[in-house]
């Protein structure tokens, strides 16, 4: 079968609400490498950002007059490049066959999307950024271990949502080393590929337990952040899931899925039949 990536859930949401905030969406990743959880409508991965310090600066530190001038010049240059590309495509249009015209239409769509993003950046460039009490040093990338690092990520995500700097965030948690949880002897990846070895399963469970403790702390942060009409958690849909239901077997069925907040009437833990059940996409559509 011809299977290819298409648009991810977060980018569909960003299309609906991304124009209302300084940052259309954030694709964050603590796992390193080139992995991204976000994909545009052409199936191209959206670049991730794994640097908390640069994200903090982007969201909360105003640029100097010189920096703003350079950014304005960069955006103007971007418009100029797009204008040149549009002119070149127009001159080629009459010379192309049907299949090439289809490719050209994709390029024209990309140009229009880039133009929208440039205009959005221009609209925000001179507006003051929100001020937060937490200093940049709290979100230093020099965290002691993955547990500390993960909690710093959650704190930064909470600030981004609280200040309405963005309304769409994806955070890839990734694998961990054995630092941060006492008496762990093997890494997260090794433990996840346990092959039903009881000792590895026990260590894997301890990694998972710490992940969920950190996640629960993040939900507590959202609950404690009060807003008109409720808490930040009441006004935020938080989805935690995985691409694997059984990492040891690389099985992608029976995925663990956790939905919090958003004003839903949650019913606690729901276990569905592994064969006769509902598509996970039903939940995604409800979120949108």
Which residue ranges define each predicted feature?
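Ligand-binding pockets and gating/stacking loops
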Residues: 1-288
């Amino acid at each position: 079968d011809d299977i290819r990536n298409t648009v991810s859930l977060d980018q569909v949401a960003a299309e609906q609400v991304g124009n209302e905030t300084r940052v259309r969406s954030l694709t964050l990743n603590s796992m390193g490498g080139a992995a991204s959880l976000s994909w545009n409508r052409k199936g191209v991965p959206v670049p991730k950002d794994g640097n908390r310090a640069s994200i903090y600066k982007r969201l909360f530190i105003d640029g100097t007059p010189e920096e703003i001038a350079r950014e304005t010049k960069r955006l103007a240059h971007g418009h100029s490049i797009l204008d040149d590309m549009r002119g070149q495509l127009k001159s080629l249009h009459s010379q192309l066959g049907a299949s090439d015209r289809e490719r050209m239409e994709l390029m024209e769509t990309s140009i229009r999307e880039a133009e929208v993003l440039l205009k959005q950046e221009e609209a925000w460039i001179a507006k003051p950024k929100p001020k937060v009490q937490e200093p940049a040093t709290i979100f230093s990338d020099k965290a002691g271990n993955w547990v500390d690092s993960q909690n710093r990520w959650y704190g930064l995500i909470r600030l981004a949502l609280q200040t309405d700097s963005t309304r769409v965030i994806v955070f890839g948690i990734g694998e961990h080393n054995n630092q941060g949880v006492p008496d762990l002897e093997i890494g997260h990846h090794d433990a996840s590929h346990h092959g039903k070895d009881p000792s590895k399963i026990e260590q894997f469970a301890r990694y998972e337990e710490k992940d969920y403790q950190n996640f629960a702390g993040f939900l507590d942060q959202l609950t404690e952040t009060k807003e008109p009409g409720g808490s930040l958690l009441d006004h935020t849909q938080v989805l935690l899931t995985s691409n694997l239901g059984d990492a040891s077997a690389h099985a992608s069925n029976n995925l663990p899925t956790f939905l919090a907040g958003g004003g839903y009437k949650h019913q606690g833990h729901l276990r569905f039949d592994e064969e006769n059940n509902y598509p996970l996409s039903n939940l995604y559509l409800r979120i949108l």
